[in-house]
Amino acid sequence: MSLNVDNVKEVLVKIAEVVNENKEELSQLDAAIGDGDHGHNMSRGFLKVVEELKNNSYDDIGSIFKKVGMVLVSNVGGASGPLYGTAFLKAATFVNNKKEIDINDFSVCLQQAVDGIKIRGKANVGDKTMLDVLQPVSDLIKDLINQKYLAKEILNKAVELAFQKVEFTKEIVAKKGRASYLGQRSIGYKDPGAYSSYLILKCISENI
């Protein structure tokens, strides 16, 4: 697995398409335990990302991630914009000036993103957030790299785990965001941020 600047841009366009296609479902999930706007906010933000990618040229992947992060922070409402934006901005610091990335780079970027989300959101695994997907997936990817699995196998297994972890969020009480106001009543519902994280990981796996 090796992605250059153009490959990364293509994957981001695909992510925007997937988010847009699933915006109603994401917002419906959010309506059950939040503000009901997660899908539409995410769609708006990623469509703006596509617009920026088409209207500008980039010499390296770090510059792309930095732009994506800034666009998401500026254009996605609620908690999602700052969190997803922070994820890309943190990843950008690692791939700064890189023109190609491989599975090892992706693994570091993902953990950088997770660390940024933890700090920005003051959250951790078990709080019923996107971290319930992203941290276990990051840990799995690192483990499979050490076991010398091929990149495609790693990503396939990561997506399987991500799906399981989305389902797991139905079983726990929300401790962050508007959903936390519901207390025990938040049990039984998927976390929309966890689900959008799964969709993005699945899209990445299918398009590289």
Swiss-Prot record:
One of its GO terms (molecular function) is glycerone kinase activity. Residues 6-206 form the DhaL domain. Its EC number is 2.7.-.-. It comes from the Bacteria. Keywords: Kinase, Transferase. It is an enzyme of class 2 (transferase). One of its GO terms (biological process) is glycerol catabolic process. InterPro entries: DhaK_L_YcgS, DhaL_dom, DhaL_dom_sf, Dihydroxyacetone_Kinase. Signal peptide: none annotated. Pfam families: Dak2. SUPFAM superfamilies: DhaL-like. GO terms for cellular component: cytosol. This is Putative kinase MCAP_0235. It comes from Mycoplasma capricolum subsp. capricolum (strain California kid / ATCC 27343 / NCTC 10154).
